Every structure is written in structure tokens, then in C-alpha cells.
Amino acid sequence: VKNFIYLPFCLFIGTSVAGALPEIPEPFKYGVGGIENGKIYIGLGSLGNNWYMIDTNQSEKKWTKIAQWPTVPREQATATIIDGKIYVFGGIGKDKSGVITLQKDVYSYDIAKDKWEKLMTRPPVSLAGHVSFIHNGHAVSTGGVNENIFNGYFSDVELSKGNSALTEKVNRDYFSKPADDYFLNNHIISYDPSKNQWKNLGTTPFPGTAGSSVIFAEQQIYILGGERKPGLRSVRSWTGELSHDRIKWSELPPVASPEGVSGAYASVIDGNIFLAGGAYFPGAAEKYSNGEYWSHKGLDKAYSKEIYQLIKNDWKKVGSLPEGLAYGVSLPWQGGMLILGGEKKDGKAVSDVIYLKKNDK
């Protein structure tokens, strides 16, 4: 764990508790993670088929390999831990022909048996770039890309290889559309592992996003930022109160204005909501508002290092990460937030473990 600095507004990034947590054995981004009973599990993304576990209850804390992922490696999936099993939903990976496609199979990992199992089920809507959380023993998911549009684009890219004019047309046709025409998923679905059944919880009152951050705490959902379309982020943030499979939504003030972020880290720290990091294209929002729908064309991706806290129903900047970072895993741990891995501005994955905690001084 890197040794960082005290930040203003009673926030601390450092090693006082996490000092014994070693770096991840491999650079890690676009993967999934979860925590149960002090044991942290991570896998997929840049780890390929590898999965690792670390038991933070032990005096000697070290990452150990667990059973390998048994099928197509993937990115932009989600993982939830329910009753001693890790459930992995969706994501994108290369099929047997080498074309990137959305993955529809569902796998569970039995922690006690160190064994993966393919489940006889499929999500009723496409899940990749979505968010998931646990409610009453069910895995709830929303957001993500449209399967037909997403798969169609990468199929066309593959077919156009070697023909630069056709490749340019494929990209122009795909990126030069308004956000609504990507049909991102705004259905809310719930999976019950005990029955191996899916349930329809309706739709969000806002357009679907991809790469949003999610927090579920005290029966309250927070969906923060994300992509409105490829290359264009959202500043919108929402909260929903979940009761008896019904959700009452309210919009929060915008966060990370004016561009928004996707792939940011989010968690509860000492009862407060935090959002950190994330990636965006500076200038894309202005270009889009001027009718340039391929809004990130010619722009460089930027990586935020800002840390925001939701204070009295408004977002306040309360500090900064040591460098811009996005697309890792964030988990609640010991009253703070762990940031596991991520991607920095050169596009490379990192092995860092960062701990954010309130400064009690």
C-alpha cells in the first residue's frame, strides 16, 4: 500500500490500517471484486482468468490464487457475494472467432469448495458496463450497453479490417449519434440465487448509463455519473429508496461538473457518500451540446484525482488522490474505502491498494 498524505476536510489517504495489505500480484483494471467476512476477492479484467483472495483478518496478509475463471475472460462484468458464493454477471470478452462480444452466461464461485459452476440461467437484459448490488439476498442490476448495437459495432470493425475507408465509415456511423440512440439499459432486474430466477423491478426514471458507480447502504441506492454514450460522460447522480421491490427515485445535484466521470470509485466512509477518480474527455460535453455527436473525437482522455463527498445534499470536493485513476474496484472496509487497482493516464493498469479514511485528528 502506498503511503500518502493527510487531506483537508477530515479525510486521510494512507496506510494506518491498510499498511499490511500488499500490492495486488498483477496490474489490475476493468475487473470485479467483493468482500465478505474480511476476505477480499478480485478477478477478471486485466487479470484474465486469474482470481485472488486476501484474508485481512490474518496477521500475515498475502494475496493467494484461488480457482481460475473457467471460461471466456471478460471486462466490465459485476460480482456480488451472497451466502458464501460469488455471482458474476455479464461483461465483454472475445468469442471463439476473436471478436469482442457481450457475455450472457452466469457463473458462481463456491468459496468453501474453491470451485466455479456455470448456472443454467441468463440475464433477461444485456449486462456489460452495468452496476450490481445486493438487497435481501438478491443481486440487483441496472445500466449497461445495448447488446445488438455493441456486438454489431465490433462485428463490423472485424469485417472492415484491411479497408481503412470502410473502418472509418463504421466508426463514423457508430459514434455520430445522440445519446438516446444507443439504447443503454435502464431496466432494473433482480436475481434470486435460491430460486435461480430473475425479477423485473421496473425501469429507472433516467436514461441508462454505462460505467456508473453504485453504492447501496441503509436501503438507499446511489447511482453516480457514468457514460451517456461512448466518449460522453454524465454529471447526473441519483438516489433511490428501495422498499418491498419498489424504488422511489430522487435526483441529486450534479457531480464532477462540467464533464462528469465514468469508472470512478465510490463507497460509504463513516456513514458518508464518497466518489473518487474516474475518467472523462475534457471538451466532449461542450462539443456534444453544439451538435457534434462524435464528441470525443480528437480529444485525449483525462483521469480525475478529485474526491467528492455528499454533504447536506450537495457534492463538495474534499481532497485528491495522488494521481488520476479509474476503472479499478472500490470496496467498503473497516469504516473506510479500499481502492484496488485501476488505470492511470498512460492507459496502464496499476497494482496499488489505496485506503481512504476519515482523519480523526
Where do the protein language model's features map onto the residues?
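Kelch-like beta-propeller repeat domains
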Residues: V17-K361
